[in-house]
């Protein structure tokens, strides 16, 4: 088992399935939520357990709604561990920049469809960036649901998409407007025109709020 990432909340390990269970030729991700020494131990334990269970439930519900996410093999609430499928492929962050424009836009539309299904399930990802999306065998997969929540409000869904737009503007700045428009078209294919208009209006509203705050800060 190899440590591949350590964040503020969790350690991420890559392991062979056979290391944990029985002989089977696949790899798995082992996500361990780490203790916070600054927290009261009882509160820390409660929070880590709640977040471990919530993430596993979110992944299960997302899959039920047809979202491409890792399959969960095990949830260990004693050690705060989730064992899940390793999605082997190429991150969209790098892949999109190598594809011809027509192919990029097709992938972006599929990203939108996947987000639409996720929001239909009453889930917001909380960290939608092309770094958390992987293309495997022609399918777009979402990973890293550590910040995800059960939330079906238009505000939360608008924030989810707004964060993706900002991330695309930063990473894919030369063509992000065309790309994000395709994301919205894919989203509308799943959720319908009425919800599409509602989400576009919410994204504009969120952007205006952000600009107002920036102007207020500058004039202070």
Swiss-Prot record:
- Protein's UniProt keywords contain Cytoplasm: yes
| Superkingdom of this protein's organism | Archaea
Quick one: where is this thing mainly located? cytoplasm
Residue span, Protein kinase domain: 1-220
The Gene Ontology terms for molecular function here are: ATP binding; ATP hydrolysis activity; protein serine kinase activity; protein serine/threonine kinase activity
Alphabetically ordered keywords of this record: ATP-binding, Cytoplasm, Hydrolase, Kinase, Nucleotide-binding, Serine/threonine-protein kinase, Transferase, tRNA processing
Q: State the GO CC annotations.
A: cytosol; EKC/KEOPS complex
Q: Which residues form the active site?
A: 127 (proton acceptor)
Where's it found, cell-wise?
A: Cytoplasm
For the ligand (ATP), the binding residues are: 4-12, 27
Q: A GO BP term, please? A: tRNA threonylcarbamoyladenosine modification
Q: Which reaction does it catalyse?
A: L-seryl-[protein] + ATP = O-phospho-L-seryl-[protein] + ADP + H(+); L-threonyl-[protein] + ATP = O-phospho-L-threonyl-[protein] + ADP + H(+)
Query: Which EC numbers does the record give?
Result: 3.6.-.-, 2.7.11.1
Q: What does this protein do?
A: Component of the KEOPS complex that is required for the formation of a threonylcarbamoyl group on adenosine at position 37 (t(6)A37) in tRNAs that read codons beginning with adenine. The complex is probably involved in the transfer of the threonylcarbamoyl moiety of threonylcarbamoyl-AMP (TC-AMP) to the N6 group of A37. Bud32 has ATPase activity in the context of the KEOPS complex and likely plays a supporting role to the catalytic subunit Kae1.
The entry's free-text remark on domains says: This protein is considered an atypical serine/threonine kinase, because it lacks the conventional structural elements necessary for the substrate recognition as well as a lysine residue that in all other serine/threonine kinases participates in the catalytic event. Bud32 has protein kinase activity in vitro, but in the context of the KEOPS complex, the catalytic subunit Kae1 switches the activity of Bud32 from kinase into ATPase.
Family per record: Belongs to the protein kinase superfamily. BUD32 family.
Q: How does it assemble?
A: Component of the KEOPS complex that consists of Kae1, Bud32, Cgi121 and Pcc1; the whole complex dimerizes.
Q: What is this protein called?
A: KEOPS complex subunit Bud32
- Native source organism of the sequence: Pyrococcus abyssi (strain GE5 / Orsay)
